[in-house]
Amino acid sequence: MLSMSNDRADTGGRILRAAASCVVDYGVDRVTLAEIARRAGVSRPTVYRRWPDTRSIMASMLTSHIAAVLREVPLDGDDREALVKQIVAVADRLRGDDLIMSVMHSELARVYITERLGTSQQVLIEGLAARLTVAQRSGSVRSGDARRLATMVLLIAQSTIQSADIVDSILDSAALATELTHALNGYLC
């Protein structure tokens, strides 16, 4: 027998998956809580018990999605080389991700690019800072405040993801990955 907490987690997961499918189909700016509930097979009050509004659902969905991508791309070591390899691979996946690209072309993206750090960005900064601290101890990453370094790494990678399409005629996917690798290695040495 499933516990109520498993049912609750499954319902939350269905809601987030429904939100993701709405974003891909309609774009972030046209997603409604009613459509998310319909696709998840739940009532609107069920959604409201978990999130206060559509924007909160979007934030949770993005955080969950980015965390899943991070889990899919292994970190093969504790040094700078392994970390840079993972960051470049994650950036490559996110550049080709329908959900992320749908979000990138929305008003929501403008908020998280120009006005404030979102939850997923903060999670990435904290995770990167922890990994950079380990790499600093081994001497493969230069000294400095790991959180500041992580924030700059996020900005570099985020810019690459956002701008890949506009520079595609100059930097195809492979060249972009090569240049991002050089940029990150140069910054972290």
Swiss-Prot record:
Record's keyword annotation contains Protease: no
DNA-binding region boundaries: 32-51
GO MF terms, alphabetically ordered: DNA-binding transcription factor activity; transcription cis-regulatory region binding
Domain spans labelled HTH tetR-type: 9-69
Record keywords: DNA-binding, Transcription, Transcription regulation
InterPro entries documented for this protein: DNA-bd_HTH_TetR-type_CS, Homeodomain-like_sf, HTH-type_TetR-like_transc_reg, HTH_TetR, Tet_transcr_reg_TetR-rel_C_sf
Pfam families with a match to the protein in the record: TetR_N (PF00440)
PANTHER family xref list: HTH-TYPE TRANSCRIPTIONAL REGULATOR RUTR (PTHR30055), MYCOFACTOCIN BIOSYNTHESIS TRANSCRIPTIONAL REGULATOR MFTR-RELATED (PTHR30055:SF238)
Protein name: Uncharacterized HTH-type transcriptional regulator Mb2274c
UniProt organism field: Mycobacterium bovis (strain ATCC BAA-935 / AF2122/97)
